[in-house]
């Protein structure tokens, strides 16, 4: 630290310690103060007295907190008012010294004239007498001074010169757990300079550079060097509450921090027992808690209001933005890793919160930086830089954190599975009029189509009815029916073998449900975090994943809930299962691992489904990401209308790849190994990055970005022009196919013919009986029919053609021709035998009856002849029994016997699965006398976060009671949950659909089967350990009981 800051300087006049009767904002310490906020109860009582009837409940709390104190209206805090006036004067003077540009904003704000420069009349503005004096004190030295004025100015300058700004050269002594890095010390000095000049600011360092630590260091400086311990408020996302609290205790333990979180009763107790007594310096709370307890927080004069992830207030009309603007604050600080996500108006919203007296008009700001009229103006860019320079500090990892390895992103392009293509086609066909620009293009309709297509790209099981069942099983079909899951199933074993640990992000929590089933099936230990995860469980999962030598391999997170403020630097691989519309959200997700403390190169794998809407979404996000860096790093301006996705652009996204999907119904998934997939993805990623860099160079030179052209121009085609002639284009839907029955051998015989001309069919007698193989005529009949056909060919002089496809074509032709030449006609006995044999088959069984018989065998199993007979319509049980006996005896005579047997065996496997599940449930339930109260489930390390054990117990016991194999059992189970008083207020369980209950029960059954198997193996091991039992004869000789239960007397 510099010499000027070695002894802690005395507090300046504006932050002098206040008397005990002063407001909380004083933050000073004296003989009656213990270092925390003082006068909290007195001020709260006074505020409650003036609040009115609406605050009656809060008045009671205040009365409890300060018994015996008389309610009286407290006078405005003179220290607070003095600090605000001094800061305002210092702020204007500081800004005008930075650049005269701020006179444009400051003078209109002081004069209260029309805010838009277009409405201001030319000429010298009129200034009121009292306002003129204020402006003169700000920096107008051109008028003639009196001697008294000059003396006052010299005294003021002298007093300012004695207050040297504190500047640290090394990590402050009050920072205990470690030392600040060089760039963090510079950031702390910048924050201190803002405070000294009465300026609020934005700390916009890239995610992972320690904005939390720099903020805590600033609050520590306020306490140790300015004697202002608080009260300070830190407003953070719910997911980062615990992290902020632990960071306070770790880095600056002398700061007393408290956390407001909980239900209504817990919050009331916190306000009464913790907040009002004032034994604290910093209050950390979430956005939601702030909104609920705004009436309490408004009663404080906050010294510092810090908002983490400040883009939450980018919309000045949101409820959170309006509430925080109502608070009394001396200083404000915004923290964000993404200072500009969309447009300049959002930047104005942040600046207006920081300095409302400077940036008081959005119209003025928008006119001053008119992106429509001034694009390409170099002076305008310089003007923007000058405006941002005093308020905003942004560093990126590549510039300041040399020890942090750069992250490497690879886009992995995957194909659609057969099921995905069917669902994708179905979604497009439902709105084919939109694709061909014939229907009404409603924006909500287009957004819904986009959402459905994105669900299809992730996994078809996200649609109700897509997953095969019941019963629902967790096995290979979970992987093979999604292209992304196929790649994931190849990638994870490779990463585990390399010793990596993985974060998987997805937009959809139901995708996390599928991934959870997959991890349980593959025995990957995992953690999960989404928007429904309770606060305590969130932190438990983070701690379990980050602890040394943790066995957790996968951490699955929803992008919105798990992408903010969480430190998961113990992972080195990030998998983006799907991409967000806003690329900043994906960047935040990546930086959960790519942050200070990371020692490995972070690899990011972004899954993109090829030739689908996902390609367009990622391309648009890449464009938006480049535009985001323009204002902050490169100085270019973003058109405000650019980031609004229009109907035409959405339509182009939907149309992209539609023709390709319609062209085939087969799967695009290949057996390519993971190394080949990664190599191909890296190559394609490099090509896309090169294309984007070339696309932006001309715009960078001219400080423009023709983003409309950039979005619509792709692969050399202007999609705006294509939209104009959309009516001439037509995406042809797939042809409807007529279903037909084919003989398998004839099909393959025709399909295998390549280019040779078809040989003429061998002639048959004109009156040939229609004989089907499933009618099981006697084999002798087929011999007689063959003899009759050969003789007919002989009579017409038929010559067998040579078949070039056969290996011994000449020999085969000779043998077949010899049969014809030696053929004889049927004699009278053979004709009579033929007629008799034609009556011995199952002539009354047609193809429909045969198909019903096969399906019944598949449904009930070959041994359940009673139920099979009921399934075959128009046949008596005796007829079915007779046919079944012949079928299983002579089934090998059928042409497609392999296909039929596979169908029946699949059905029998399902039956056996149902039996094994029923047996497992019977075994589990049988261990308890009162299973609805006593049953315990062995979750192991993979307990889900959504369902409680009480809910799981009820599901299993009620499923067993209703009957697992009963039809519509899950609909009945859902009704039982709704009727049960036990779950009267369990809205989560009561809102589950039948399919969601099936999936949960399937997971529980898997756990029960695993538990039963482990118990059986344990019992076998114990029996083996005890050794074989003694033989019966030996026991009887030793006096063992006989068959009647008595011991035989031994004769001596």
From Swiss-Prot:
- SANT domain: which residues? 840-892, 943-1007
Composition bias of kind Low complexity appears in: 16-55
Effect annotated for changing residue 211 to R: Abolishes ATP hydrolysis. Binds to chromatin itself, but abolishes the chromatin binding of the cohesin complex component RAD21
Which residues are modified to Phosphoserine? Answer: 66, 116, 137, 171, 755, 825
Where in this protein would one find the motif DEAH box, according to its record? 308-311
Q: Which residues carry this modification: Phosphothreonine?
A: 113
Q: Which residues carry this modification: N6-acetyllysine?
A: 440
Keyword rRNA processing tagged: no
Describe the location of the Helicase C-terminal domain by residue ranges.
Answer: 487-638
What's a single GO MF annotation on this record? histone octamer slider activity
> Where is this protein localized, as stated in its record?
Nucleus; Chromosome
* Cross-linked residues, Glycyl lysine isopeptide (Lys-Gly) (interchain with G-Cter in SUMO2): 83, 644, 647, 694, 722, 735, 966
Modification sites for N-acetylserine: 2
Could you list this entry's UniProt keywords, alphabetically sorted.
Acetylation, Chromatin regulator, Chromosome, Host-virus interaction, Hydrolase, Isopeptide bond, Nucleus, Phosphoprotein, Repeat, Ubl conjugation
What tissues contain this protein?
Answer: Ubiquitously expressed.
Superkingdom: Eukaryota
Biased composition annotated in UniProt, kind: Basic residues: 1023-1034
> Which residues lie in Basic and acidic residues bias regions?
69-83, 1035-1044
GO terms, biological process = antiviral innate immune response; cellular response to leukemia inhibitory factor; chromatin organization; chromatin remodeling; DNA damage response; DNA methylation-dependent constitutive heterochromatin formation; DNA repair; DNA-templated transcription initiation
Question: Which is a Pfam family this sequence falls into?
Answer: SLIDE
Family per record? Belongs to the SNF2/RAD54 helicase family. ISWI subfamily.
Subunit and interaction comment: Component of the ACF-5 ISWI chromatin-remodeling complex (also called the ACF/WCRF complex) at least composed of SMARCA5/SNF2H and BAZ1A/ACF1, which regulates the spacing of histone octamers on the DNA template to facilitate access to DNA. Within the complex interacts with BAZ1A/ACF1; the interaction is direct and is required to slide nucleosomes from end to center positions on a DNA template in an ATP-dependent manner. (Microbial infection) Interacts with JC virus small t antigen.
* Annotated function: ATPase that possesses intrinsic ATP-dependent nucleosome-remodeling activity. Catalytic subunit of ISWI chromatin-remodeling complexes, which form ordered nucleosome arrays on chromatin and facilitate access to DNA during DNA-templated processes such as DNA replication, transcription, and repair; this may require intact histone H4 tails. Within the ISWI chromatin-remodeling complexes, slides edge- and center-positioned histone octamers away from their original location on the DNA template.
- Name under which the protein is recorded: SWI/SNF-related matrix-associated actin-dependent regulator of chromatin subfamily A member 5
What gene codes for this chain? SMARCA5
């Amino acid at each position: 630290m510099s010499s000027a800051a070695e002894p802690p300087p005395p507090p300046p006049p504006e932050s002098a310690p206040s008397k005990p009767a002063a407001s909380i904002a004083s933050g000073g310490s004296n003989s009656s103060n213990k270092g925390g906020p003082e006068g909290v109860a007195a001020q709260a009582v006074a505020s409650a007295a003036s609040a009115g009837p609406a605050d009656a409940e809060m008045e009671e709390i205040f009365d409890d907190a300060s018994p015996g104190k008389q309610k009286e209206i407290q006078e405005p805090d003179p220290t607070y008012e003095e600090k605000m006036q001094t800061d305002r004067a210092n702020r204007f003077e500081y800004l005008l010294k930075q650049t005269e540009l701020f006179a444009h904003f400051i003078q209109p704000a002081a004069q209260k004239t029309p805010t838009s420069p277009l409405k201001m009349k030319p000429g010298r503005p009129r200034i009121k007498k009292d306002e003129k004096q204020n402006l003169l004190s700000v920096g107008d030295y051109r008028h003639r001074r009196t001697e008294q004025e000059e003396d006052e100015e010299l005294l003021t300058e002298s007093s300012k010169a004695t207050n040297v700004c504190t500047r640290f050269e090394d990590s402050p002594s009050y920072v205990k757990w470690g030392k600040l890095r060089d760039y963090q010390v510079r950031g702390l000095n910048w924050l201190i300079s803002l405070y000294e000049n009465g300026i609020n600011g934005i700390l916009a360092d890239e995610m992972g550079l320690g904005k939390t630590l720099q903020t805590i260091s600033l609050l520590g400086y306020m306490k140790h060097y300015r004697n202002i311990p608080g009260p300070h408020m830190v407003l953070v996302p719910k997911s980062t509450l615990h992290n902020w609290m632990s960071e306070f205790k770790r880095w600056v333990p002398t700061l007393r921090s408290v956390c407001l979180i909980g239900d209504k009763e817990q919050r009331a107790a916190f306000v009464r027992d913790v907040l009002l007594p004032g034994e604290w310096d910093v209050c950390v709370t979430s956005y939601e808690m702030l909104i609920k307890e705004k009436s309490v927080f408004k009663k404080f004069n906050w010294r510092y209001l810090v908002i983490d992830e400040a883009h939450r207030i980018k919309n000045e009309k949101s409820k959170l933005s309006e509430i925080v603007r109502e608070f009394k604050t001396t200083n404000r600080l915004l923290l964000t890793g993404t200072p500009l996500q969309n447009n300049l108006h959002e930047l104005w919203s942040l600046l207006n919160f920081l300095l409302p007296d400077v940036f008081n008009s959005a119209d003025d700001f928008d006119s001053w930086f008119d992106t429509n009229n001034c694009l390409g103006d170099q002076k305008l860019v310089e003007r923007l830089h000058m405006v941002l320079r005093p308020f905003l500090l942004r560093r990126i990892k590549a510039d300041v954190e040399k020890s942090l390895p750069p992250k490497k992103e690879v886009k992995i392009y995957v194909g659609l599975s057969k099921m995905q293509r069917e669902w994708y086609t179905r979604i497009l066909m439902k709105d084919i009029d939109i694709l061909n620009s014939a229907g009404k293009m409603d924006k909500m309709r287009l957004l819904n189509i986009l959402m459905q297509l994105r669900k299809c790209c992730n996994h078809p099981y996200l649609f109700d009815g897509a997953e095969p069942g019941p019963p629902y099983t967790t096995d290979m079909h979970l992987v093979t029916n999604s292209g992304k899951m196929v790649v994931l199933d190849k990638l994870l074993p490779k990463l585990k073998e390399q010793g990596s640990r993985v974060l998987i992000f997805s937009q959809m929590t139901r995708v996390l449900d599928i991934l959870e089933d997959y991890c349980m099936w593959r025995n990957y230990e995992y953690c999960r975090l989404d928007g429904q995860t309770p606060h305590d469980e969130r932190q438990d999962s983070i701690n379990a994943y980050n602890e040394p030598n943790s066995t957790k391999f996968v951490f699955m997170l929803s992008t919105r809930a798990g992408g903010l403020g969480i430190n998961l630097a113990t992972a080195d691989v990030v998998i983006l299962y799907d991409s967000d519309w806003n690329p900043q959200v994906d960047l935040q997700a990546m930086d959960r691992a790519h942050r200070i403390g990371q020692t490995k190169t972070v690899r990011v794998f972004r899954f993109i489904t090829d030739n689908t809407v996902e390609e367009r979404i990622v391309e648009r996000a890449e464009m938006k990401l480049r535009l985001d860096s323009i204002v902050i790093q490169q100085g270019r301006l973003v058109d405000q209308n650019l980031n609004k996705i229009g109907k035409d652009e959405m339509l182009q996204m939907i149309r992209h790849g539609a023709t390709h999907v319609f062209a085939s119904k087969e799967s695009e998934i290949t057996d390519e190994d993971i190394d080949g997939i990664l190599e191909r993805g890296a190559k394609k990623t490099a090509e896309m990055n090169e294309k984007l860099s070339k696309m932006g160079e001309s715009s960078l030179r001219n400080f423009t970005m023709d983003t409309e052209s950039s979005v619509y121009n792709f692969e050399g085609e202007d999609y705006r022009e294509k939209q104009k002639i959309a009516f001439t284009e037509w995406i042809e839907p797939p042809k409807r196919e007529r279903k037909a029955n084919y003989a398998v051998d004839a099909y393959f015989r025709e399909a295998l013919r390549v280019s040779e001309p078809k040989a003429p069919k061998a002639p048959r007698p004109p009156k040939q009986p229609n004989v089907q193989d499933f009618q099981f005529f006697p084999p002798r009949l087929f011999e007689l029919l063959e003899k009759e056909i050969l003789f007919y060919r002989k009579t017409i002089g038929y010559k067998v053609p040579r078949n070039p496809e056969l290996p011994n074509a000449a020999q085969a032709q000779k043998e077949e021709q010899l049969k014809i030449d030696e053929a004889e006609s049927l004699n009278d006995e053979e004709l009579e035998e033929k007629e008799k044999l034609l009556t011995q088959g199952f002539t009354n069984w047609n193809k429909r009856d045969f198909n019903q018989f096969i399906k019944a065998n598949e449904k009930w199993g070959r041994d359940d002849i009673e139920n099979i007979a009921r399934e075959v319509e128009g046949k008596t049980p005796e007829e079915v029994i007779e046919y079944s006996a012949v079928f299983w005896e002579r089934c090998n005579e059928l042409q497609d016997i392999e296909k039929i047997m596979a169908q029946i065996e699949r059905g029998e496997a399902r039956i056996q699965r149902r039996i094994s599940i029923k047996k497992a449930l019977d075994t589990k339930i049988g261990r308890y006398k009162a299973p609805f109260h006593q049953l315990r489930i062995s979750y192991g390390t993979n307990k889900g976060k959504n369902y409680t054990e009480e809910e799981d117990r009820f599901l299993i016991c009620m499923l067993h009671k209703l009957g697992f194999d009963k039809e519509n059992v899950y609909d009945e189970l859902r009704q039982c949950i709704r009727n049960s008083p036990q779950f009267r207020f369990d809205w989560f369980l009561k809102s589950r659909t039948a399919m969601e209950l099936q999936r949960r029960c399937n997971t529980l059954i898997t756990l029960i089967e695993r538990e039963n198997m482990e118990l059986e193996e344990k019992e076998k091991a114990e029996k083996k350990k005890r050794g074989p039992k003694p033989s019966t004869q030996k026991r009887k000789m030793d006096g063992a009981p006989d068959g009647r239960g008595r011991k035989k007397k031994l004769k001596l």
